Amino acid sequence: MKKDSKGLKYKQRTISVWNEVAPFYHKRWAKNEVGPFGVTKKLLDMSKIKKNNTVLDLACGTGLVTKKLIRKVGSKGHINAIDSSESAIKIAKKWTGDVKNLHFVRADAEKVHFNTKFDSITCQYALFFFPNEQKVLKNMKKMMKENGTITLAVHGKYNVPYFDCILESVKKFIPDYLPKYPEMDRFGTKETFSAAIKNAGFSKIIVKKFVFKYSPGTFSEYWNNYKKHLSKPLKEKFDSLTKFQKANLREMVKDKTLEYTKKDGKIVFPWEVLVLTAKNQ
């Protein structure tokens, strides 16, 4: 019960955060496929989704993958897109427009059920948000056609300095800055990613690694944008630091960014992404 209670609390917190940050996330990242969002094309290529397919976009967010699926499946295909954030779905609906064969559903991925059987399921940058990913994956498997394909993308564990430069430093001042449950980077290697999917009963697993580049601008732009767009729970923790602590933290983060800083003062980060495909057999 303790784990279930922790999972429920985490899910509620995640929904609240995404309802808050979805507009910024869409504008800065998803809408223009910035940095790691360049992986969307790779994910769809690896999915081998065809015209007339029936597809489920799991944790669709603000609709980046969903929007591209419309052309992939054509007018005779069908797309269901689910997410737990009402704010994200609202943006996705507006962005994708009035498409007759596309349906958005606000739902819990552990419990959602469709009478439809899917040829393919896509999930970009969301698996790590599920506190019980096995429950989600097994639920997805039940709704897939035999020999159907699931395709997922996650951030790498070791080569994503955009996050690490700040988070490694912040945790020295605020050890509980991020929730310890679930671990957000637990699928960030080919081995751990494959193992999770295999444990859910999938087979013919293929994982590919891609490295993208992303520039947040100068250090000041990187630092100020991070602070500006913190979700409420993180902002409260960050603001609990003294002025002196914040100044020290800023310098620690700046030191970590130096190896990625070009002569013109702009930071260019590498960003590792893993994409996995597997079969329901």
Give residue ranges: language-model regions.
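A short acidic, Gly/Pro-enriched loop at the edge of an enzyme's catalytic core
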Residues: E110-I121
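A generic alpha-to-beta junction signature in SAM-dependent methyltransferases
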Residues: S47-I49, V73, T96, M144, ...
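Conserved class I S-adenosyl-L-methionine
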Residues: K2-K51, L64-K68, A88-I91, W95, ...
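Conserved Class I S-adenosyl-L-methionine
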Residues: K3-Y10, T14, R28, E33-F37, ...
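Class I SAM-dependent methyltransferase SAM/SAH-binding core
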Residues: T54-V112, K135
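Conserved catalytic/acceptor-binding region of the Class I
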Residues: Q134-K135, T149-G217, K263
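A short SAM/SAH-binding and catalytic strip from SAM-dependent methyltransferases
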Residues: D119-E133, G156
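Short glycine-dipeptide loop
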Residues: N52, S75-K76, M144-T149
